[in-house]
Design a protein with these regions (language model features):
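Conserved catalytic alpha/beta core of Sir2/sirtuin-type deacylases, generalized to analogous enzyme cores
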Residues: 1-273
């Protein structure tokens, strides 16, 4: 099975949902081979899904890389690294600890062509699609993903392509090609599936979140290089916080890949003194 997914929230405060955890369990049980996500929220990685079984086609907001190093050097952070980046401007302001080259985010904006091997993993996505007997689309509108012909085996006759199953509340451009289309919420459908398979309902536990073991610590001189809220470790310590003793106002609504332009025209309220 080859899985295409889309989550309902792209905020850095989000945590893996029931659907994310169910997908991870289905992969563990060898019922799902590969997951393709168009989101940049890193939630599939945080669910515990192995990186080699995941293609984040539009990047991951927690990953910055050094393309000057060979092979490309990757740094996973506990905060959104896209604070200073935008279309065609991907430098994060931090430097590689090995070669001092500028680190860049991994986000692929509309109109850009992603070239990074990871976390995009286009090769893994295309190879998985070629081997798939079923494609399950969960919560994705497919308005963007439909354009990627290699994901749908469009080079084959219709009868030779993987069977398509879609779960989404709204219409998708692939509905007419689906073997089954369920108009429902992903968590509800996945919950019923877990019951049908007699699997224990998986629950996200922050103590098991792999991002804490994968994360690259900031160097002392980099501590003030961002103002994003840091994902708190399970023990509550903010080891990598830009301002351990203070608070960052309205961080979820500032710039970055998901909030660009949100604050335009908004008036900032003055604090009472």
């Amino acid at each position: 099975m080859f899985l295409l997914t889309n989550s309902s929230s792209d905020l850095s405060k989000a945590e893996p949902t029931l659907t994310h955890m169910c997908i991870r369990m289905l992969h563990k049980e060898k019922m799902v081979n590969h997951v393709v996500s168009q989101n940049c929220d890193g939630l599939h990685m945080r669910s515990g899904l192995p990186r080699n079984a995941l293609s984040e086609l539009h990047g991951n907001m927690f990953i910055e890389v050094c393309t000057s190093c060979s092979p490309v050097r990757e740094c996973i952070r506990l905060f959104d690294v896209t604070e200073r980046t935008s279309l065609h401007r991907h430098g994060t302001g931090r430097r590689c600890s090995q070669c001092s080259g500028e680190l860049r985010d991994t986000i692929v904006h509309f109109g850009e062509r992603g070239t990074l091997e990871q976390p995009l993993n286009w090769r893994g996505a295309a190879d998985a699609a070629e081997r798939a007997d079923v494609i399950l689309c969960l919560g994705s509108s497919l308005k963007v993903l439909k354009k990627y012909a290699c994901l749908w085996c469009m080079n084959r006759p219709a009868s030779k392509r993987p069977k398509l199953y879609i779960v989404n509340l709204q219409w998708t451009p692939k509905d007419d090609l689906a073997t089954v289309k369920i108009n429902g919420k992903c968590d509800d459908v996945m919950s019923l599936l877990m019951e049908e398979l007699d699997f224990q309902m998986p629950v996200y536990n922050r103590a098991d979140d792999p991002i804490f073991t994968l994360a690259t610590p900031l160097r002392p001189e980099e501590v003030d290089s961002h103002t994003r809220e840091v994902i708190a470790p399970p023990d509550g310590e903010h080891e990598f916080s830009a301002d351990p003793g203070g608070q960052v106002e309205d961080t979820a609504l500032q710039g970055g890949w998901f909030g660009r332009g949100y604050n335009k025209g908004r008036k900032k309220k003055k604090k009472a003194t």
